[in-house]
From Swiss-Prot:
InterPro entries: CmoA (IPR005271), Methyltransf_25 (IPR041698), SAM-dependent_MTases_sf (IPR029063)
Signal peptide, first to last residue: none
Name of encoding gene: cmoA
Biological processes, Gene Ontology terms: tRNA wobble uridine modification
EC number, UniProt record: 2.1.3.-
Pfam families named in the record: Methyltransf_25
Name used for this protein in its record: Carboxy-S-adenosyl-L-methionine synthase
GO MF entry, a single one: S-adenosyl-L-methionine binding
Catalytic activity: prephenate + S-adenosyl-L-methionine = carboxy-S-adenosyl-L-methionine + 3-phenylpyruvate + H2O
Similarity-based family: Belongs to the class I-like SAM-binding methyltransferase superfamily. Cx-SAM synthase family.
Residues involved in S-adenosyl-L-methionine binding: 40, 65-67, 90-91, 119-120, 134, 201
Free-text function comment from the UniProt entry: Catalyzes the conversion of S-adenosyl-L-methionine (SAM) to carboxy-S-adenosyl-L-methionine (Cx-SAM).
Amino acid sequence: MTHKTDAIYAAPLQKMIDFQFDERVVAVFPDMIQRSVPGYGMIISNIGIVAAKYAQAGSHCYDLGCSLGAVSLAMRQRITQPDCDIIAVDNSPAMIARGRELLALDTAPTVPVTMICADLQEVAIENASVVVLNFTLQFIPPAERLALLERIHAGLRPGGVLILSEKIAFGEPGRQQFHEELHHDFKRANGYSDLEISQKRSALEKVLIPETLACHHERLQAAGFSFSELWFQCFNFASLVAMK
């Protein structure tokens, strides 16, 4: 299955609308995410490794905000515990439809994967050993994030983990500027124009709300996790593991 090149913001837009995961984005998503998020491929592959370590026999693994299912496929390829399954959730019908097509191409279906089109805030989390929020929490209204993490913590087995990847913010203006400028340089190096960078930033401004690492660690502790550890960071993108 071929994927198109992202050119959604290549031409000047008459009217800027908030970013959404519609059919246009789905068609170019693999290209968009690889060219926009530094270290994305490494994050995906290592989520598979972490999931393999902490998946427990007879449990569920959740991929919340699964988009096209890259995390689910990475977990599926690594998990060896018996009677595990993966529940992948996204609220975009277009994402789920394309994700199911990609899932069907996987030639080694060792772990069952169920892709569900639903609001992840309304999906029951139960008997879980691994839960992944890979660049998902940042799209949840900040006031609702703690409640979601509390539900995840409650649904995890003892010894289970939450893997949380996010675009992050920095409290000091100098550090914020440092990381933002390098991220923009990364996107330019991957072929995005200044117009594309500017227009996408405007489209995401009210939709994607990043927070500091300290904020994430504090919220995870408040949700009941015993500890959280930063395992990956490249510029203003990071991933943490939180242990129950």
